[in-house]
Amino acid sequence: QIVVVVPEKAEYEVGFYKWLEHLARMGEQIDCRITFHTHPATMKYIKGYMAQKHTNVRTNFVEMNKWSGIRQMAVGMNEDHMLVVVTARPGFISYSRAMDRFPQILSRHFKQTNIMLLYPDQWGDPMEELTIFAPNGRAVTVQPKSFGGWIRLGWRKLLSRKYTLTKKGKK
């Protein structure tokens, strides 16, 4: 079994679908169940992607609103399980200060568990908007929810266009 812990707002990071695709392929190739522990808002994107792209992968979804819940997960972990913790770098939307304590938590509570720490791509050409298909077949488009998300979106658009600087009076 692959147990994946995903932070809230991870769906807004550039590398979200890349790591999700790699884990889905891994689950498909070794024919094992993937259990995602994540915030309900992030869960709908993972569910939508898995339902659209990887219907044959067995998945479970568990709501996890706080990072403190990661300690209780150690009780149900076996030696043949793999724990994947999706993290983020400071300054990015899915980063939480609780992530700074992961090394201590993982070394103390998950000694006999295979662990993978994932730092997804956070640079590159993100999609300007995320589109997935809801289970009812309708397209769902999400725009950034935070002010910082709108600023980053505007900054990317500005950088994607070629602007020329001209002196006053010259064309």
Annotate the PLM regions.
Residues 1-67, 78-82, 88-94, 102-171:
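Intrinsically disordered or low-complexity boundary/linker segments at protein termini
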Residues 75:
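PAPS-dependent sulfotransferase catalytic core
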